[in-house]
């Protein structure tokens, strides 16, 4: 049965699609853009109040377009858009505060964030807390904070925001606290199950040490093995929702290493 909150969300989304919406100077970040028709771009934005918004930037590919210099990843923007249907028309576009420059591996990490947001967010669903997390993550990537730690924190927050939080506190069967000295089998969207021994032929990718789960829960790890386990776990958890199509950002990162 659909919850009252879910029904309200669906109704709001339907209204945004049906109504001739006009939104002025909404804080946003560009997630992705594609050529559209002869001179335009089809752009996906992550906005503060409306979540993911897809809009046509008319004439954006023309050399003298007012949009050309501003439609860049990691540049805080203020966007205006209007129109009916899923795809809106981009109006005024202004810079927000200073751009967040990312370089090298941190640039590819930022592109990875944009790609998974594009894959997982539905149009016109508000995610204010996630928007703030995204912005904070970009700032953290710009600084000296350990990159893997920054990414794992965002991935955990993203899954929680979408209703797929990973319970790193307890075994999903017995509800006993995770034991640092035990091994657990992970099932996406279900949780961790204590195992007495690893069966012959069982995929090790789903097996995790309790100490590694506790390290991820605390978002701190001293051992390289804990860092690798955290990455493996989040990749498993996200894969269920991202689908089978490979991520372009991962391919780009691999090709430039």
Role assignments for model-derived ranges:
Residues 1-2:
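Methionine residue identity
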């Amino acid at each position: 049965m659909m919850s009252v909150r879910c029904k309200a969300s669906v109704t709001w989304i339907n209204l945004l699609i049906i109504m001739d919406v006009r939104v002025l100077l909404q804080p946003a970040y560009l997630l992705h853009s594609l050529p559209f028709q002869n001179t335009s771009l089809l752009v996906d934005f992550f906005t503060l109040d409306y979540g993911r918004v897809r809009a046509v930037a008319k004439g954006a590919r023309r050399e003298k377009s007012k949009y050309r210099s501003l439609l860049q990843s990691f540049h805080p923007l203020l966007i205006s858009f209007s129109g009916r249907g899923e795809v809106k028309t981009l109006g005024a576009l202004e810079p927000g505060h200073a751009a967040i420059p990312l370089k090298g591996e941190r640039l590819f990490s930022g592109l990875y964030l944009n790609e998974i947001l594009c894959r997982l967010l539905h149009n016109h669903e508000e995610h204010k807390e996630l928007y703030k997390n995204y912005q904070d993550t970009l700032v953290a990537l710009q600084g000296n904070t350990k990159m893997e730690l920054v990414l794992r924190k965002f991935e955990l927050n993203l899954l929680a925001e979408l209703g797929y939080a990973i319970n790193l506190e307890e075994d999903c069967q017995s509800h006993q606290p995770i034991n640092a000295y035990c091994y657990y089998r992970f099932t996406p969207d279900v949780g961790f199950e204590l195992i007495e021994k690893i069966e012959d032929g069982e995929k090790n990718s789903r097996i995790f040490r309790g100490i590694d789960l506790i390290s991820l829960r605390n978002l701190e790890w001293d051992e390289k093995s804990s860092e690798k386990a955290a990455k493996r776990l989040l990749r498993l958890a996200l894969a269920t929702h991202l689908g089978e199509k490979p991520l372009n950002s991962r391919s780009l990162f691999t090709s430039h290493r």
